[in-house]
UniProtKB/Swiss-Prot annotation:
Name of the protein described by the UniProt record: Large ribosomal subunit protein bL36
GO biological process, one term: translation
Keyword presence, DNA-binding: no
NCBIfam families: rpmJ_bact
Gene name, Swiss-Prot/TrEMBL: rpmJ
Coiled coil: none
Family membership: Belongs to the bacterial ribosomal protein bL36 family.
Ribosomal protein in keyword set: yes
GO cellular component: ribonucleoprotein complex; ribosome
GO MF terms, alphabetically ordered: structural constituent of ribosome
Keywords (A to Z) from UniProt: Ribonucleoprotein, Ribosomal protein
Length: 38
């Protein structure tokens, strides 16, 4: 998982989710695309 200042969708399977006041990118197809903002 990457922690970044700005998160972007890396593919069409990525979803942007808000959890606990943080923005996350979760990907069903490629788990390497997981990211968290902050």
């Amino acid at each position: 998982m990457k922690v970044r200042a700005s998160v972007k969708k890396r593919c069409e399977h990525c979803k942007i989710v808000k959890r606990g006041g943080k923005v996350w990118v979760v990907c069903s197809k490629n788990p390497k695309h997981k990211q968290r903002q902050g």
